[in-house]
Each structure stands twice: as structure tokens, then as C-alpha cells.
Amino acid sequence: MGTRISSIHGRMVLDSRGNPTVEVDCITEDGTLGRAMVPSGASTGRHEAVELRDGGGRWAGKGVDKAVANVNGPIAEALVGMDASDQGVIDAAMMALDSTPNKGEIGANAMLGVSMACLRATVGTGDIWQHISDGEASIPVPLMNILNGGAHANSNVDVQEFMVVPHGFDSYPEALRAGTEIYHSLRAVLKEAGLLGGVGDEGGFAPNLPRNEEGLRYVVEAITGAGYTPGEQVSIALDVASQEFLHDDGYHIDGKVMSGSELGQLYSSWLDDYPIVSIEDPFGEDDWDSWVEFTQREGHRVQVVGDDLYVTNPERLAHGIDIGASNAILIKLNQIGTVTETLVVIAMAKAAGYGTIISHRSGETADSIISDISVGTDAGQIKTGAPARSDRTAKYNQLLRISENCNKYADMF
């Protein structure tokens, strides 16, 4: 059998922040190599599967020797000789090696690297998106992070991501051009305002601003400056990542302390004044009441996205669906740790009528598998940073390649 695994080998490589991460090679009996690199987040939910790090002094505690050893030891011992194309069996075999509920012994970073490498080895020179598709496929609308704050930037801006959403176009290449032109337009807008400084982890600009709402104003100015119509051709999405500024006494934003209800009213005022189509993590990861209140009031006019709320976990998603906490979910492979579990959560969300957004992490690599997964699952949306820095453009460029054979651009918003 050509897809039987002959070897699995893990190694340490560097991610886009210069931190160690895991890379895995899976070689099958016919000589096919599947290689995958694992991303890492900065604003992580506490309910995520465990990213196994070494601690100690080397690599500032961020080494991955333990995770790599688990790839080359127990995982390789369990999987060599198995059929790489049996994705569900492969992933289940890895999970059976770990007795914890959150992959804390083997590490989600070890498992995910192997899971993705096996998928790549199975497909070989073929297309991953076609391999996983059930017949429906489309190029996703990109949510392009052009202004960074929060944990992704060294600035005073609380909101983590201000994204442009080029939904009003007939094709992905047109949409990508619009988003990229707006990115460059924002550079000019910020330079004119004397605010052009560094960039954040995901390639977006990271200015200091007097209020978070100023970020919305500058993004709208960039959209119009590039010659596009806000709200019709290009809209705005936010990742508030509010868990990062939630403290015991409330949400600390714009120099104020707010309750969940008050914060929700602030968002409502932004929805009134700006072409916002999506808000991610508007409340803390366990502030279920605020989520429900806001979604009931505003879910008819904005996509309310759970990231830290759900952490790509089917149990948390099931609870959110039951109580109406949101109407969309962000999907991050490393939050759950295997390809199989990721696909299950996507299917579960779609069955509930939820929007699905396939996402990168702030600590990224040149791996572009999320592009294929977003197309093959017909997710409709992808979030993969600014159209700058090769760790981000790798995903956009892969979508360009795929669009040569899949010319349906998702109809969103």
C-alpha cells in the first residue's frame, strides 16, 4: 500500500516571531513526503488544547524539544506502518497516547504537526482542498488585518485587529487586489497623520491612537482613499480579543471600566456609525451572559464570532449553540490539535447555521494548509493577517493558485 507510513520525523523550526515551533515530515512507502509546520498564538484562550513547551532558560522557556521528542518517540512508534490516508484512525491513535482531556502530555503542537503531515503525504502532488471537499467548495472572503493592537502590537490600542473585508467582488483576485490596495492606502493615511510606526505580529500597522474608534475612522478613510465604497464593496471586521482587557472589576477599554452590557452598547454605537460586518470575541471567554445578550440584540445585523469562547472545541461550541451565544465560530487547527477534530467542528457549526472562519495564528509559518481547508470545507471566510510578510502572503498566494481551478468566490455579507 503506497500510503502506508514508513517514517515520521519531527524537528524544531522557527515561526514568524522567531520562536521555536514543530515541523513534521511524514514519508510513505511510495516515497511521498508530507511536511507540515505548526503555528502558535499570542492571545490564547485558557480552554485551548495544550501547546507543549519546555520551560526553563533555553529559548526563553519556549523550546519545543519535548514536543519533538513525542513526535519522534511515542507518536512515530504508534503510527509507522499505518495507512496515512486513514486520517481519522491516525488522529485517534495519537489521542489514545494522551490521557489528559487537553492533550497536555503529548502536546497539541506535536499531534497537529503529524496530523497535517499525514494529510499532505496522502494527497501527494494533488490538492488538499479537493481531497477533503464533499463537493461544495469556494474561495473564502478574506478578513485582512491591516491595523493591529492588543496582544499583537506594542501600542495603546485595545482592539486587537481591525480588518477589511472585500466581499463586494466577483472573484478572489479582484478582492485580494482591493484589500491590498487598501492596506497601502492605510499606510499613506497614517503617514499623513504622523502615526506611521511599526507593524504588529500579523503585518498590520500598529499606531498609538487616542481612542479605539479612531482605528475605525482611519480604516474607512483608507477604503475610500483606495477608491472603494465602504459597506458595499469593502466592510470592516473586528477582533476585539476582549479577554485580554477583562479584569476582576470589568472590561478596561479606552481608559474606562465597563460591564459586559456597557461594552455591548459601545459596540452597538460602532455598528450604527461604521460598516462593520463581523465582531470577534466581543466579550470574555466565560462571560456567556454578555454574549447571549449582545447576539440576541445585534446578531441580525452583525456576525458575532467566538474564538476564545469556543477554542475550536465541540463541547464548548455545543453549549454556545444551545444558548445562542453567537452566530459564527473561528476555526484554528492548533486549538484542538488534529485535522479530524477540526473538520468535525466545522461540520457541527455549519449544521447549526453558524458562519465559519478558518484562521491563522499570530505566530505563523510558511505553511499554507489553512487555505486548502478553507476552500475544501466551503468555509466562506478566512483570516490570515495583512497582505504583507511572507508568513501571511503564503496563504493568500495559495488561494490565488487554487482560484485557477475553483473560480467560485464565496457570497458573504
Ranges and model annotations:
Residues 1-22:
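Short, Gly/Pro- and small/polar-rich lid/capping loops
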Residues 13-15, 24, 100-122, 141-158, ...:
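Conserved phosphate/anionic-ligand binding catalytic regions in large, soluble enzymes, centered on
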Residues 22-29, 36-40, 144-166, 221, ...:
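Short beta-strand elements
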Residues 39-127, 131-132, 176, 204:
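Metal- or metallocofactor-binding catalytic centers and their adjacent structured scaffolds
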Residues 137-200:
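Mobile "lid/hinge" segments at catalytic clefts and subdomain interfaces of large enzymes
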Residues 161-172, 196-212, 241-254:
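Active-site-proximal beta-alpha loop/turn segments in soluble metabolic enzymes
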Residues 213-413:
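Catalytic core of soluble alpha/beta enzymes
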